């Protein structure tokens, strides 16, 4: 688990946080037009930022699950395309994680392609091969005389497992809270867009008090049209609509919408 500290301008009254995950660049069923549109939105929206949360590349190999013959281009070309696509928003990337599709190259050859993407984009210090806790600060508390920024903690990882059923995927998402205390939890991998909230009593040692807080949980979608491996294995068609997180810079408030 890596800690990443991000401080954004205090002038921001709110931010949009977009997650790019399970894009599967190189797969014949990747909706590249939709990906380009989402990247363009982040680039053109001053208060929009993003996380790259694994499986950016399809990265099928001869010895992995998947079909190398259904890929539009090879893994090296996939890496180059990913860097070209995300270059316009490289300054808006707050974290990059490692997915199971990128892990194919690591298991066989020790090559960490997700790190290479982060390095080429100039955000290697924001890369993690496992998970990350992001300490995000921006804005200014309304009416506060000490210029205090709003602070949010985000626990993010690509994820694993989850099964085929929606309930199992929801449990996988909720279980993130048993690992670390955070305001927001972001999970990908299971291709099911999902948003939920839970209450929690957070202790404060300095004041010897407990405060009731709300935690936000987000599971992201896959950017794939139906077909190929998913159809052959009888997986359900998935929605490509993925949650966007909205954070308030004047008070502690967080929501997500599909």
State where each predicted segment sits.
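Conserved beta-sheet core of the metallophosphoesterase superfamily
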Residues: 153-255
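Beta-strand-turn-beta hairpins that frame and shape the catalytic cleft
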Residues: 6-18, 135-154, 212-215
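Short helix-terminating capping/connector loops at secondary-structure junctions
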Residues: 44-46, 91, 148-149, 210-213
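Charged, low-complexity C-terminal accessory regions
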Residues: 93-96, 103-195
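Short, flexible, glycine/charge-rich loop motifs used to bind or transfer phosphoryl groups or to couple energy/partner
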Residues: 6-8, 40, 84, 144-145, ...
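Core catalytic region of metal-dependent phosphoesterases/phosphodiesterases
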Residues: 4-128
């Amino acid at each position: 688990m890596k800690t990443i500290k991000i401080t954004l301008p205090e002038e921001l009254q709110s931010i949009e946080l977009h997650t790019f995950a399970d894009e599967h660049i190189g797969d014949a069923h990747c909706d590249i037009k939709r990906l380009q549109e989402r990247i363009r939105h982040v680039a053109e929206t001053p208060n929009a930022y993003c996380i790259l949360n694994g499986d950016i590349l399809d990265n099928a190999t001869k010895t992995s699950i998947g079909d190398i013959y259904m890929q539009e281009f090879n893994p090296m070309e996939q890496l180059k395309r990913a860097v070209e696509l995300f270059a316009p928003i490289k300054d808006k990337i707050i974290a990059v994680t490692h997915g199971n599709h990128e892990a194919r190259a690591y298991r066989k050859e020790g090559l960490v392609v997700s790190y290479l993407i982060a390095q080429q984009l100039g955000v290697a210090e924001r890369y993690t091969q496992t998970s990350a806790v992001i300490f995000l600060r921006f804005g200014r508390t309304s009416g506060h005389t000490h210029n205090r920024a709003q602070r949010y903690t985000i626990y993010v990882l690509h994820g694993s497992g989850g099964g085929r059923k929606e309930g199992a995927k929801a449990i996988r998402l909720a279980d993130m809270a048993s690992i670390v205390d955070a305001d927001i939890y972001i999970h990908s991998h299971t291709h099911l867009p999902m948003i939920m909230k839970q209450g929690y009593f957070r202790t404060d040692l300095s004041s010897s008090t407990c405060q009731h807080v709300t935690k936000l949980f987000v599971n992201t979608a896959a950017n794939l049209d139906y077909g190929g491996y998913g159809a052959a294995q009888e997986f359900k068609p998935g929605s490509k609509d993925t949650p966007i997180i909205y954070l308030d810079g004047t008070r502690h408030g967080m929501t997500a919408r599909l």
